[in-house]
Every structure is written in C-alpha cells, then in structure tokens.
Amino acid sequence: MLKLILMMIFISPICFMQGLFWMVHNLLFVITFVLILMNFCLNYFVNISYFMGFDVLSYGLILLSFWICSLMIVASESVNKYNNYKNLFLFNVLMLLIFLVLTFSSMNLFMFYLFFESSLIPTLFLILGWGYQPERLQAGVYLLFYTLLVSLPLLVGIFYLYKNCNTMNFYLLSNYMFNCNLLYLAMILAFLVKMPMFLVHLWLPKAHVEAPVSGSMILAGIMLKLGGYGLLAVFSFLQLIGLKYNYIWVSISLIGGVLISLVCLRQTDLKALIAYSSVAHMGIVLGGLMTLSYWGLSGSYTLMIGHGLCSSGLFCLANITYERLGSRSLLINKGLLNFMPSMTLWWFLLSVCNMAAPPSLNLLGEISLLNSIVSWSWLTMISLSFLSFFSAAYTLYLYAYSQHGKIFSGVYSFSGGNIREYFLLFLHWFPLNLLILKSEVCLFWI
C-alpha cells in the first residue's frame, strides 16, 4: 500500500521540471497498470500497513481514481499549450490523487474523514485557479459550504463512536450495531451531500459549469463516488437503524431523480445538462444502496464505476466542442454532425452508455439497482419507470440537439479531432464496455 503512495510522492518533483508534462501522465499510467497487476479481488482487507488497506470496493475506486487522473492530464492540453501555470496544475492533480487514494484505502474512520475533507482543497484550487468565468468564486463557495457544513456532525459522530467503542477501525466497528437516531443522521448526512442527494445537490451543477475540464472530470468521476463509498462504509454498523429510516432517503432520491430529469430536459448549457444527469444517476445509486440488499449494494458499486467513466467522457466531449466553438450553449452547438463528423461517433457511444444501453457497465448497474429497489417496494416502480424513460429522453435530447439541426451561422469552418482526443475518449469508453465481460469483479464483492 505504501509503495503506491511513495511512487506518487516521488512523482511530485517531476511536476516542476520543464518539458515533462507528459512524463507525469505516463508515470500515472504505469502506476495504474501496476495496480491492475496487483489484482486484489478479495472481499476482506489485504495489504494492510498501519491505517491503510485494500478491499475490493476501495481497489476498484482507487483504480478509477488513477485512470481518471491520468486522463485529466490528457484532457488539459490547453493548460500545457498556453503554459497556464502547468507545473502547479500537475502538482494539484497529483495531490488530489494522493488524497483520494488515501481516502479509499483508510481503515480508520478518522483518517477517512481527514482525507475525505482534504480532497476538497485541491478540487477548490482547480475550480478557482483554472475555471473559465468569474462566477467560479461563487461555485467555490457553494462547494465549500455545502460540504463543510455537514461534515462537522460527521466529525462529532466519529468522536462519539470512539468514546463508546474505543476504536475507529472499520473492521472492528462492524461488530457493533447502533440504534441512535442522531448518530445515524450525523454519520450519513455528509455523504448524502457528497453524493449528491436531491435537495442538497445545488453545489454540483454550479461547480461543474464553472470548473475546467479536469475539474469536471474529477468531480463527476471520483468526488461523487466518495459519498457512495462513505455510505457503504458506515452502513456496516448502522444496519438496524438504517432499515428503520432508509425509506426517507429512497423516496427523496427516486422522486428527486425524476424531477432532476425534467430539469435536464430544459437545459441549454451542455455542461449543466451532463451535471444534472449525474445527480439523476446518483439518485438511483443512493436508492439502491439504501435498500441494503445484496443487489442494491453491488449494483450501486457497479453504477458508480460505470457512471464515473461515462460522465467523465461526456465532459471531455463537451470541452472538445467548447475549445472549437468557444461556447457551451446548445443553441450554438448545433449541427455538429457537419462540423466535426468524426466526433459524432463518440457523442453517440458515450450518450448511449449514459442512458444504460448494452453492453455498458451502466446497464448492469441499473438492472441490479432496479431489481433491488423494486423488491424493496412495488410502489417504486412508478418513479423508476419515469426515471428510466426521462433518462433516455434527456440523453437523446443532448445527442440530437447537438449533432443534428441547422448549423449555427457563426461557425465558418469544419474541424477534425486530433489523436489525443480520440485516445482520451477511447480510454473512457473502452473500459466501460469491456468491464461487462468481467462483471464478477463489480457484482460479487460482498
């Protein structure tokens, strides 16, 4: 476990050397493949060193973190080209990656909290330092306040646990069962905001719209998964009270998912549309996770990984067209089929993955989640059917409006993609569709 952390710490001086922008990216890819070869597909903690260890859940999410972070560097070519504080940018991405890996590999609840909150700081720097509009300050404040306001109860809850159990180790805490309402609320609220659950999701579209492409990728790809991972961690000792109160969160997230899907249908901003679709997807993840059934837990993990790759890829696409046209508005991003014919294929592939068409990992996750939520209560079928329908509707809206229609009169030339962009999109789409062939890694980890 320490070897990965040390490898990343030793990459940090390379960030500040001239002309080694791609070297950092290559080294991150090397670490990713080292991690794949280590292959911890075990349902208990392995590779334990002090407070860090791996289980299957954290293994998949750490792998996703490495993958997305190395792709962030590929996507942020403009930072390199215009020399926009690129050394600082690389260092920021690396620090974020280190915090994420430490978060996912913590076995101690307090260490988990510490790194969970620390990962907010580099993200904030990304948004404030490399964002596009002046409104990024407002987005940063939203992000910070939503997250920090609810993380204080989490800290108090962790100290309460420590006072009662004399331990903060996940493995030992799972022997206890707590039935305290306030503790339940305190432990769970921070993760609901991070997911984000409907009603506390307002920071997400703001942060996404103002963030640079790398910020959007890391937010959609990993940050939302921290909430899901945290919930999976704390429910090991909150099962009893969870079964009593979870219906509240399931109802909010399913009804919220439908409402957010309707909001999606009237967005004119590409990034905002993709951001709201993330909220809808995480709503169904939250619903499945809260049923606490086998299908629900494995499906939520599968959809988290699938959504991380898919949503990140869509943000890359939105950024590619933004770099060419200088706008994210759907009123200007019209008729892209004429403007960038070769990118239309990628728009199509990632859009259908977003609406959970086979053979994507999202399909597998959504089927498991539908299974778990419907078996939990028959009434949920109503909102689930709406959710599935509108999910397809807004994805088709995104695809059809951007690719078809009359080309905007201000666009005067055609534009091809370059190899870097195809490579980037391929590396989002390929694992997404390949993993369905090795789905036992995602489904049979409990």
Curated annotation (Swiss-Prot):
**InterPro entries, from UniProt?**
NADH4_N, NADH_UbQ_OxRdtase, ND/Mrp_TM
Q: Does the keyword Coiled coil apply?
A: no
Q: Give me the reactions it catalyses.
A: a ubiquinone + NADH + 5 H(+)(in) = a ubiquinol + NAD(+) + 4 H(+)(out)
Keyword Mitochondrion, does the record have it?
yes
Q: Quote the EC number.
A: 7.1.1.2
Location of the protein in the cell: Mitochondrion membrane
- Tell me the name of the encoding gene: ND4
Q: Name one GO cellular component term.
A: mitochondrial membrane
Give the top-level enzyme category: translocase
Which family is it part of? Belongs to the complex I subunit 4 family.
Q: How does it sit in the membrane?
A: Multi-pass membrane protein
Q: Where are the transmembrane segments?
A: 4-24, 28-48, 56-76, 88-105, 109-131, 141-161, 182-202, 218-238, 245-265, 272-292, 297-317, 330-350, 373-393, 426-446
Per the annotation, which location comes first and is thus the protein's main one? mitochondrion
The upper taxonomy is: Eukaryota, Metazoa, Ecdysozoa, Arthropoda, Hexapoda
The Gene Ontology biological process annotation of the record reads: ATP synthesis coupled electron transport; electron transport coupled proton transport
Q: Which UniProt keywords apply?
A: Electron transport, Membrane, Mitochondrion, NAD, Respiratory chain, Translocase, Transmembrane, Transmembrane helix, Transport, Ubiquinone
Summarize the protein's role: Core subunit of the mitochondrial membrane respiratory chain NADH dehydrogenase (Complex I) that is believed to belong to the minimal assembly required for catalysis. Complex I functions in the transfer of electrons from NADH to the respiratory chain. The immediate electron acceptor for the enzyme is believed to be ubiquinone.
The molecular function GO annotations come to: NADH dehydrogenase (ubiquinone) activity; ubiquinone binding
The family database entries (PANTHER family) matched by this protein are listed as:
NADH-UBIQUINONE OXIDOREDUCTASE CHAIN 4
This protein is called NADH-ubiquinone oxidoreductase chain 4
Superkingdom of the organism of origin: Eukaryota
